[in-house]
From Swiss-Prot:
It comes from Homo sapiens (Human). GO terms for molecular function: damaged DNA binding; DNA damage sensor activity; polyubiquitin modification-dependent protein binding; proteasome binding; RNA polymerase II cis-regulatory region sequence-specific DNA binding; RNA polymerase II-specific DNA-binding transcription factor binding; single-stranded DNA binding; ubiquitin binding. One of its GO terms (cellular component) is nucleoplasm. This is UV excision repair protein RAD23 homolog B. Belongs to the RAD23 family. PROSITE patterns: UBA (PS50030), UBIQUITIN_2 (PS50053). Residues 188-228, 364-404 form the UBA domain. Pfam families: UBA (PF00627), ubiquitin (PF00240), XPC-binding (PF09280). Residues 81-143, 252-271 have a biased composition (Low complexity).
Length: 409
């Protein structure tokens, strides 16, 4: 028989197999034909007519119609996300280890050592993934600058790591962000995903509730549909939706503040218990959880903002995605303070949180941009939220708001 298989990313392929064979044999055939990295047997879940196929059961028992398709869901191993950012950075120091060692000796003899060269000897002896991206590329750039110009070595060596750090930091941040949001769908992809999961035999309301509970992660949404939504997240998602506009204007900026203020906390608190547990005591995280539960599609933008403000925190999130999602699913604690309004001119926009008012300063140009977005017919709270989430880019914010309106319709 010929089995048509379809992934949650809407990739379709066919496998020829004897119906007397077991489901596990089909999984092994998928792995051999499509690759062990993309479709490992241990990570495959085959779903037909809303049921997970049992490995030891023969295919004929499920009466699979060749005109229909079997859904393939692949769960990625947790360890894969850890070395990803570091592997791209390690190749450069590895290839220049010999040059680096000679560079270190010449710099040591210089009359005035440059502080930026302190980490030069590190990559020669340290290669684990825990080494930071910013310290690794420094010797590579130092070696390149030392070789052609030995006399004025101090000037280029001191300045070159800055450029290298910024580029490597950006690339590692983008890798972390892609890793953290790779499983999320928004916009038109969201609608396609709803249709795709409905084709497994579920009602639209069930699918939307599962996607909401999983924050638009299709793999986890299917698991919720099969196993049940934990903690009745379905009912929590509908509680108090109007508060989004009244609790405060730029809640995404509160998340940025949380990211900026938790760098030190991460290093001190993560030693005891789970690395993300410290977030529970952060009022900014409470606000973020409330925002995301009311509007899950904001999660990618907020993760991107965290990546800019605190890449270490984003790395922790990407390494512990399931725990992070679980924390976001927890009931929101009662927040103190009432919602605030907007100021005029170059004044500030009020934001509620933790029993007192916070103000975000905006320029007259930013105020005008917010007013133009409000003129499109969106409430002020949502406009400000979108404007800050989109890095004060008016066009992106407008597209985001229009997309939100389309999704709700």
């Amino acid at each position: 028989m010929q089995v048509t298989l379809k992934t949650l990313q809407q990739q379709t392929f066919k496998i020829d197999i004897d119906p007397e064979e077991t489901v596990k044999a089909l999984k092994e055939k998928i792995e051999s034909e499509k690759g062990k990295d993309a479709f490992p047997v241990a990570g495959q879940k085959l779903i037909y007519a809303g049921k997970i196929l049992n490995d030891d059961t023969a295919l004929k028992e499920y009466k699979i119609d060749e005109k229909n398709f079997v859904v393939v869901m692949v769960t990625k191993p947790k360890a894969v996300s850890t070395p990803a950012p570091a592997t791209t950075q390690q190749s450069a120091p590895a290839s220049t280890t010999a040059v680096t060692s000679s560079t270190t000796t010449t710099v040591a003899q210089a009359p005035t050592p440059v502080p930026a060269l302190a980490p030069t000897s590190t990559p020669a002896s340290i290669t684990p993934a825990s080494a930071t991206a910013s310290s690794e590329p420094a010797p590579a750039s130092a070696a390149k600058q030392e070789k052609p110009a030995e006399k004025p070595a101090e000037t280029p060596v001191a300045t070159s790591p800055t450029a290298t750090d910024s580029t490597s930091g950006d690339s590692s941040r983008s890798n972390l962000f892609e890793d953290a949001t790779s499983a999320l769908v928004t916009g038109q992809s969201y609608e396609n995903m709803v249709t795709e999961i409905m084709s497994m035999g579920y009602e639209r309301e069930q699918v939307i509730a599962a996607l909401r509970a999983s924050f638009n992660n299709p793999d986890r949404a299917v698991e919720y549909l099969l196993m049940g939504i934990p903690g009745d997240r379905e009912s929590q998602a509908v509680v108090d939706p109007p508060q989004a506009a009244s609790t405060g204007a730029p809640q995404s900026s509160a998340v940025a503040a949380a990211a900026a203020t938790t760098t030190a906390t991460t290093t001190t608190t993560s030693s005891g218990g789970h690395p993300l547990e410290f977030l529970r005591n952060q009022p900014q995280f409470q606000q973020m959880r409330q925002i995301i539960q009311q509007n899950p599609s904001l999660l990618p933008a907020l993760l991107q903002q965290i990546g800019r403000e605190n890449p270490q925190l984003l790395q922790q999130i990407s390494q512990h995605q399931e725990h992070f999602i679980q924390m976001l699913n927890e009931p929101v604690q009662e927040a103190g303070g009432q919602g605030g309004g907007g100021g005029g001119g170059s004044g500030g926009i009020a934001e509620a949180g933790s029993g007192h008012m916070n103000y975000i300063q905006v320029t007259p140009q930013e105020k005008e941009a917010i007013e133009r977005l409000k003129a499109l017919g969106f409430p002020e709270g949502l406009v400000i939220q979108a404007y800050f989430a989109c890095e004060k880019n008016e066009n992106l914010a407008a597209n985001f708001l229009l997309q939100q309106n389309f999704d709700e319709d």
